[in-house]
Amino acid sequence: MYAQGYFAYDSKKSGGLTVSHLRFGHQPIKSTYYISKADFVACHNPSYVDKYEMVEDLKEGGSFLLNCPWSDEELEERLPGKMKKIIAEKNINFYTIDGIDIGKEIGLGGRINTVLQAAFFKIAGIIPEEDAKKYMKDAATKSYSKKGEKVVAMNHAAIDKGIESFHKVNVPEAWETAEDKTVDVPATGDRADVVEYVNTILKPVNAYQGNKLPVSAFSNHVDGTAPQGSAAYEKRGIAVDVP
């Protein structure tokens, strides 16, 4: 089995976006481009469903795993109409898992990577489940043994929970005709240069669409400078809990 990983991440000091492009195969992998036809996509933060295109690049019949605390009924209200429509039209296998709740239950708090990784191997079926479980537990033991048996046991529990705790959503037929009610509200303000920069460049970049910007979008910034004050327009709302 061969594997290839490419990780695209932003420059945020913490809480930034990371997109992992992973390929697996029985022959050497020499692809040098982002994945645009995926068999599996996972979203680890529920707030991302309103911020990024999550399922557009999934293949027909692919799998989508969403980490969220929502019930099937709540998904109806929480998911954008465009996402629901694509899930239904492409016959996507849609799964949810509450990784945050699992992390709190076993003592790992917001550290959910192990939980989601275990769910990935179970759903994707790249290697037999028992092999995946063994490899992950062996790796956890090697990585955390110096921190004590309790930490190792928590990570082993996270692996078991990730494999058994995801839920397959019964996608309603009505999602095929779901309407996209997303409204793009342009930035406003007293400084025209900041507003122009935010609407033309910052918002597409923050939506992970920067590679689609035309050269003309940068006509007012040919020297690479950006106006000060744009941080006031960037309230990401990615926190799991708000005090």
Identify the function of each model-found stretch.
Residues 78-143:
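Short alpha-helices
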Residues 132, 148-243:
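Ferredoxin-type iron-sulfur electron-transfer modules and their immediate structural context
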Residues 28-60:
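Glycine-rich phosphate-binding loop
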Residues 1-41:
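Anionic-ligand anchoring segments at beta-strand to alpha-helix junctions in alpha/beta enzyme folds, i.e.
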Residues 43, 65-66, 117:
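Redox-cofactor binding/interface segments in oxidoreductases and associated redox assembly factors
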Residues 55-94:
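ADP-ribose/adenylate-binding Rossmann-like module
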